[in-house]
Regions:
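Histidine/acidic-residue-rich, glycine-tolerant segments that coordinate divalent metal ions
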Residues: 10, 17-28, 34-35, 41, ...
Length: 170
């Protein structure tokens, strides 16, 4: 089996004053990534103590660059190069579960990250003469709204589906 944890820090300045505050200025382990690393290191410790009771191989995968949609490619390529694994498990902290509870559902548990880019082109002009311009702003807004409606209109409400357009650059 393969057990994976994301461990990257984020380019966010940690403003709170807590004992576990990042010691590196301008970056922090938000989203629980330090906890993910600790869980996988704890798993490594426990598995090493019961090594003689295991029948099979466990790959512990520490994934970097998860927040930018990268890092997993190397892990997947490695696992394919060894013939694959029977099961892959991803770790993630969840605030809804009580301390000490491990939630291991059958199938996906959280949304994944996938980037996409759409270019809407216009022709500049003055706001007082919209007839002489091609305004890209309103069509771009329409696109965002239509994308956000995909889960409600095109997916079974009993299946999980999240689509989050998160950035517009103009």
């Amino acid at each position: 089996i393969a057990i994976r944890a994301d461990i990257d820090s984020l380019p966010v300045a940690e403003a709170n004053e807590v004992p576990y505050k990042s010691k590196v200025e301008g970056v922090m382990h938000a989203c629980g990534h330090d906890g993910h690393a600790a869980m996988l290191l704890g798993t490594a410790h426990v598995l090493s103590e019961i090594r003689d009771q295991l029948c099979g191989t466990v790959y512990l995968c520490f994934q970097v660059a998860e927040e930018i949609g990268a890092g997993a490619d190397e892990i997947v390529a490695f696992l394919k190069s060894i013939g694959g694994v029977d099961q892959a498990i991803g770790t993630h902290l969840a605030g809804g579960d009580p301390a000490g509870v491990i939630n291991l559902p059958n199938g996906p548990m959280m949304a994944g990250a996938l980037g996409f880019e759409i270019t809407v082109k216009g022709v500049g002009g003055h706001g007082s003469r919209p007839d002489r311009a091609v305004d890209p702003v309103k069509p771009a807004c329409d696109i965002v709204l239509k994308i956000a409606m995909i889960p409600a209109q095109y997916h079974n409400p009993f299946d999980t589906c999240v689509v989050s357009p998160c950035q517009i650059t103009a």
